Amino acid sequence: MVMTNVAAGSALRVDEVRKSFAVPDAPGTRLLVLDGISFSMAAGELVSLVGPSGCGKSTLLRLIAGLDLPDAGDLLVGEEEILGPSAERGLVFQDPNLFPWLTVRRNIEAGLVARGVLHEKRHEVDEFTRLVGLGAFGSAYPHHLSGGMSQRVALARALINHPKVLLLDEPLGALDAFTRMRMQDEVLRLWENRRTTMLLVTHDIDEAIYMSDRILVMTRAPGRIDRTIDIKLLRPRDRTSDSFLRLRSQILEHLHFAGKAADV
């Protein structure tokens, strides 16, 4: 297999990926959503994906998660081709999708149950419950939790499988502004603790700048990578600094041209 435009030895490689969907009311017609997407991620890197609404960001995440297959191109984690779902790729959505009849601890265990390794790994449940700051809430049920706490459970459930890549599909999008900023710090703390490779889809430009090593800017559909922006600001980052605000203006300008003033 020959990989183009991507780095060999990467944690995640996406090479010339195309994806289309059938148009229900037009037999034989397909809508091209992704058109030649290529990028790679180094192990331990945190990268954000931004772009106009409908440009295919979530579709791309589904392909990397193995929930759907591309029409063309290659997706690899390490040297292994992505052909379906795997515990090597964790996925966290905007909705935490907790089981309401299970406690926090049991919800986190669900990640191990799905892999059939609960018996061998049960000792890690307490570790990950504490890791996300919920050590005192292991016996609580989802209806006792705030939105931010629920997302912490979802993160722990994904991380307990020790994924090589964690995919985050707007996981903080439903939270209020204050909680969202606190959870950004929480995700960064988990990332610094575990150094898990993370790919974050977000509509929040400030969030992307605050959290990421790099930002990939997509065009409107059919989605392509328009440009890559390296974020060289030291952490912790100051959202009010001149350098932060300059980056924000730069990215918004790129998005304006990439999306022709589409809603971002």
Predicted segment positions?
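ABC family nucleotide-binding domain
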Residues: 7-195, 199-204, 211
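Active-site/binding-pocket entry motifs
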Residues: 20-23, 235, 257
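Extended, non-globular alpha-helical segments
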Residues: 174-177, 246-264
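Conserved catalytic segment of ABC-fold P-loop ATPases
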Residues: 211-217
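Conserved beta-strand-loop-alpha-helix hinge in the C-terminal portion
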Residues: 221-250
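Short hydrophobic beta-strand elements within the C-terminal catalytic ATPase subdomain
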Residues: 77, 217-218
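Residue-level detector of conserved, well-ordered beta-strand and adjacent loop positions
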Residues: 83, 93, 219, 230-232
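Short, low-complexity, intrinsically disordered N-terminal peptides in bacterial proteins
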Residues: 1-9, 264
